[in-house]
Amino acid sequence: MIYEHGGDLDKAINKYGGKKEQWIDLSTGINPNSYPHSDINITEFRNLPSKSDILKLNEIAKRSFQTNASVSSLMGAQAAINILPVLFPIGNITILEPTYNEYNKVFSDFSRNIITVRTLHELKNSQIAILCNPNNPDGRLYSNEDLIELSKNVQVLIIDESFIDQYPEYSLSTKINNQTNNIIILRSFGKFF
């Protein structure tokens, strides 16, 4: 099951009333007053991206995020979160909380054993450890050193860096190498672009 992730104004209007133009939808991160891109060819929106388009996009992402790690482009961090239970069909899931609740929801849908913890130290010895850096909603930050050390003590470390652009020195994406091949980092292109 894929959970709703904002943007359903009809549902909100049915529950709370009002008209669409009276609502400000902050749930999607889409600017209702976007920049007028008059130089974009509309035909670009009529075709699915080609393999070469995707490879080019991944190279741009690698440069933008200053990483040599493998990159996969998806339709947002939420799309990545939704496929995690399929990528990791076995193993206990340990989530550092409080945090973005979609991790718990998607793994619960797959009847996974979920353990919630409150400190970075409690993630040690996890099969699959999940945290946000900075954390959503409280903004906690974790150092690169602490995260690399943690990665040595878990089977898989998933780090959601969707809001890291404000703190580039805390991003682990520039530190990924063949010694850290058990780390998966989720980055978001649209949060601050």
Predicted regions and their residues:
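Hydrophobic/aromatic beta-strand patches that form the interior of the parallel beta-sheet core
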Residues: 22-26, 72, 94, 115, ...
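Glycine/Thr-rich phosphate-binding loops of Rossmann-like dinucleotide-binding domains
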Residues: 34-36, 81-82, 103-104, 138-139, ...
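N-terminal "arm"/small-domain region of PLP-dependent enzymes with the aminotransferase-like
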Residues: 1-53
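Active-site pre-lysine segment of PLP-dependent enzymes
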Residues: 108, 120, 124, 137-157, ...
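Short glycine-rich anion-binding loops that position phosphate/pyrophosphate groups of nucleotides
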Residues: 29-35, 77, 133-137, 164, ...
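PLP-dependent aminotransferase-like
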Residues: 86-144
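Redox-cofactor binding/interface segments in oxidoreductases and associated redox assembly factors
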Residues: 28, 95, 130-131, 159, ...
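Conserved beta-loop-alpha segment that forms the PLP phosphate-binding cup at the N-terminus of a helix
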Residues: 55, 68-93
